[in-house]
Amino acid sequence: MYLPQEIIRKKRDNVELTADEINFFIQGIAKETMSEGQIAAFAMAIYFNDMTMDERVALTCAMRDSGMVIDWSHMNFDGPIVDKHSTGGVGDVTSLMLGPMVAACGGFVPMISGRGLGHTGGTLDKLESIPGYNITPTNDVFGQVTKDAGVAIIGQTGDLAPADKRVYATRDVTATVDNISLITASILSKKLAAGLGSLVMDVKVGSGAFMPTYEASEDLAKSIVAVANGAGTKTTALLTDMNQVLASTAGNALEVREAVQFLTGEYRNPRLFEVTMALCAEMLVNSGLASDIEQAREQLQAVLDNGKAATCFGKMVAGLGGPVDFMENYDNYLEKAEIAKPVFAETTGYAYAMDTRGLGMAVVGMGGGRRVASDSIDYAVGLSDMIRLGDEVNTDTALCVIHARSEAQWQEAANAVRANITIADEKPAPTPDVYRRIRAEDI
């Protein structure tokens, strides 16, 4: 038996906590015997003194075990259970292709995803632009669709990592969000509760990333890899670029349309293709479905070419309540905005820089994202045909096409697009799509 205030005092005084002490505190949060004040004090003590790697592992495991941990053994999957998590960005639609591609190669991907908040788009919001798609199925349906389609992308249920929900709500109002120990435990507790065999983290870098600098992104990636492996789940991370919109589109229905076109081969944005392939290949190698990256990429290209990946996506959509003919008739099902017209550059030169966060907020401003969690979403609005950094620009060059509900909304978005794309006389230095891979042995 421990006293909560003694645990808080130890952390306040920068004394390392034991796994039992951390577990006691987190169980108290889940059972609601800890007050909000105690949670806030605990979070602030961690914020100022941080945690050792052993403490981070203990915190993550305690939060994971605060609710249901899914056990897939009764499903008799004949392949590894794998997943990917992204720190989020703009036009980051990789999950919608990655899940089906890995499934088509023999993996099982029970992906529990989130909604968009702030400038980042949410995978669930994108999928809910598909009529009938149910993001909150029963556990039995979740398991059955994962088995039948190889992939099921759904929302977090209340019984997964409930302690994280309380801790996060307190962090949000006490200025303790941006601490790597707390971020690591929050991300991993939810992911590891899904009963994964292996995980790949996509940690974004750049103007649209969650972390403010390359170094901070790298520190987070290293923390997640070390802690997840310490908690018993084989995990690697890729640092990928978010200095510009990743896909050609930003906006819910627009991104789903692009994902379908990617899977069917109708259109594949080169940067989106490279990042998606890199993440998928990492998942195949991690889980033993491929012996090396080269073999993995060959397998992935094959399931794109032969249509197996597209079939898996179609099965998932139908299995979760969406149209059975979605892949064939997606354009009829996805909502369209009344206005779709380009915004042109006002000067000549090169697309030199993007404030990707600002472009994401332009989509939010149109109703395509949330300012607060209770906001409703307009699935049709957004940006498409995004210009790429390094492209030559003149006054006849479209920076993007804006999909809006009214002329006034279009004009407001056009102003935001122009303000967040820098045109310069010189070409920018190219940035890699994938900066580096981080594995347990690299730390």
Curated annotation (Swiss-Prot):
Q: Which cysteines are joined by disulfide bonds?
A: none
Native organism: Photobacterium profundum (strain SS9)
Q: Which GO terms describe its biological process?
A: pyrimidine nucleobase metabolic process; thymidine metabolic process
Q: Which GO terms describe its molecular function?
A: 1,4-alpha-oligoglucan phosphorylase activity; thymidine phosphorylase activity
Per its database record, what is this protein's job?
Answer: The enzymes which catalyze the reversible phosphorolysis of pyrimidine nucleosides are involved in the degradation of these compounds and in their utilization as carbon and energy sources, or in the rescue of pyrimidine bases for nucleotide synthesis.
Q: Does the keyword Transferase apply?
A: yes
- Give the gene that encodes this protein: deoA
Q: Does the keyword Glycosyltransferase apply?
A: yes
One Pfam family name from the record? Glycos_trans_3N
What Enzyme Commission number does this protein have? 2.4.2.4
Which pathway is it part of?
Pyrimidine metabolism; dTMP biosynthesis via salvage pathway; dTMP from thymine: step 1/2
Q: Which GO terms describe its cellular component?
A: cytosol
Q: What is this protein called?
A: Thymidine phosphorylase
Q: What is the lineage of its organism?
A: Bacteria, Pseudomonadati, Pseudomonadota, Gammaproteobacteria, Vibrionales
State the UniProt keywords alphabetically: Glycosyltransferase, Transferase
Which catalysed reactions does the entry list for this protein? thymidine + phosphate = 2-deoxy-alpha-D-ribose 1-phosphate + thymine
